[in-house]
């Protein structure tokens, strides 16, 4: 069973097993959550999603997580373009 340990705006972070789950509460859980290994990474992704930031140091996994979390189509498209430009494009589940 997971336990909510942090919330900022519509994003909740839950402790789950040996990792963390970030959920955009404005989306269905199936389509609006992602898993991360540490709390620091979870908070960074939440802040980036809220501010709609894109960092050059983001990994493919981080970009895919932000794509799943965001409701903002313009931000989602920028993230997808970053994946394509970086040559790290893969199947995206949005």
Residue positions per predicted region:
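A short, exposed loop/beta-hairpin motif centered on an aromatic-Gly-Thr core
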Residues: 25-44
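Short N-terminal "domain-start" leader segments
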Residues: 1-21, 71-93
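Residue-level detector of alpha-helical secondary structure
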Residues: 43, 47, 51, 58-60, ...
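Intrinsically disordered, low-complexity, compositionally biased regions/tails
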Residues: 21-23, 36, 59-60, 91-94
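Generic N-terminal leader/processing signal
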Residues: 2, 7, 39-41, 55-58
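Amphipathic alpha-helical interaction segments
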Residues: 19, 28, 47-48
């Amino acid at each position: 069973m997971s336990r909510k340990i942090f919330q900022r705006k519509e994003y909740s972070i839950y402790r789950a097993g040996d990792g963390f789950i970030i959920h955009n509460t404005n989306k269905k859980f199936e389509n609006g959550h992602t898993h991360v290994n540490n709390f620091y990474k979870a908070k960074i992704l939440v802040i980036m999603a809220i501010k709609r930031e894109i960092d050059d140091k983001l990994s493919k996994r981080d970009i895919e997580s932000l794509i799943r979390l965001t409701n903002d189509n313009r931000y989602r498209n920028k993230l997808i373009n970053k994946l394509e430009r970086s040559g790290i494009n893969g199947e995206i589940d949005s």
